[in-house]
Amino acid sequence: MTKTEISGIAPFFIVRNVPVALSFYRDRLGFDITFQGPTEDDIFFGIVQRDAAMIMMKEIGVDPVPNYTRDIKKGIARWDAYLHVPDPDALAAEFQSRNVEFFHQIQKNTMTKFWMV
């Protein structure tokens, strides 16, 4: 059986405020907003894209609980997504130039060309 191509995958983040999150991804991280809605008066879902990377986000009416701590027994990891980029140092410098703040310092790991965000 031949394999059908999967051309990408997009993480889905629950956020406190979709318009604010969309602005952050556009203005600070350099993404393009490709969708926000379902209407101009009721924006609770959005999609951003930068090159081949896409992120979907949704507001659910209650504050999300971030996974910035690690508790394996409870099934909680401290990261939500990995970025694969040809030049992680350049991306880190770009984010620093845009005054992006992280809970933990961006780090290289043992996998080449991957950064934890």
Regions found by a protein language model. Give the residues of each.
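A detector for short, charged/polar N-terminal pre-domain segments
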Residues: 1-5, 68-71
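Vicinal oxygen chelate
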Residues: 1-4, 13, 83, 92-117
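Core segments of cupin and vicinal oxygen chelate
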Residues: 3, 12-54
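Eukaryotic phosphotyrosine signaling hubs
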Residues: 8-9, 76-80
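Short amphipathic alpha-helices within nucleic acid-binding modules
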Residues: 23-24, 89-94
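A short, acidic/glycine-rich surface segment
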Residues: 34-35, 42, 57, 63-69, ...
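Short hydrophobic/aromatic beta-strand or adjacent loop that forms the aromatic wall/cage
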Residues: 43-45, 78, 112-115
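Short, charged/polar surface micro-motifs in flexible loops or helix N-caps
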Residues: 51-55, 61-64, 87-90
